[in-house]
A protein has these predicted regions:
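P-loop (Walker A) phosphate-binding loop of NTP-binding proteins
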Residues: 13
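Conserved lysine of the Walker
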Residues: 18
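Hydrophobic anchor at the beta1->P-loop junction of P-loop NTPases
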Residues: 10
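ATP-dependent small-molecule kinase phosphotransfer cores
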Residues: 32-127
Length: 170
């Protein structure tokens, strides 16, 4: 097995094709003999997945404060870094994340209006130097992304159910 200590992330709104591109990349890297760890954010570790459930729960729509949302995303990220990302990198694996800190800047910093300065301060504490060396942003028209998401046939989660204007700010 080939070793590498690389950490990459893909960013974009829901329906932009992140997961599809990540799966194709992982397939190609695995065929070349690399050990690859895939994770999604929020999630990827047991505690982080529980935090994800809270963040996406439609029962909290209109109840969860923007700062709570920001702190929960950072809590999930801190856990997945400690439990999954850093150990994988230390073991010479490639880590590919379906979203990472840039989503927090876009969603909470800009779309929620909390500001880049606050997000930056929390991100520095949360990540403690563990950042992707490359992030690819998949840009797609909001309406096209929403149409793709709707084709999945799943009920929209708390964030997916935001108005189009929210995603335009993202």
């Amino acid at each position: 097995m080939k070793t590498s200590k690389h950490f990459f992330s893909l960013e974009g709104i829901d329906g932009s094709g992140k997961t599809t591109q990540i799966d194709m990349l992982i397939d190609a890297l695995t065929k070349e003999g690399y050990s690859v760890v895939k994770l999604r954010e929020p999630g990827g570790a047991k505690i982080s997945e529980r935090v994800r459930e809270i963040l996406l729960d439609t029962n909290f729509k209109g109840i969860m404060s923007d700062k709570t949302e920001l702190l929960l995303y950072n809590a999930a990220r801190a856990q997945v870094i400690a439990e999954i990302i850093q150990p994988a990198l230390d073991a010479g694996k490639i880590v590919i994340a379906d979203r990472f800190a840039w989503s927090t800047f876009a969603y909470q910093g800009y779309a929620r209006g909390l500001g880049a300065d606050l997000v930056q301060r929390l991100t520095e504490i949360t990540c403690d130097g563990c950042f992707p060396e490359l992030t690819v942003v998949l840009d797609i028209d909001v309406q096209r992304g929403r149409a793709r998401t709707a084709k999945r046939g799943e009920a929209p989660d708390r964030l997916e159910s935001e108005k189009a204007e929210f995603f335009e700010r993202v």
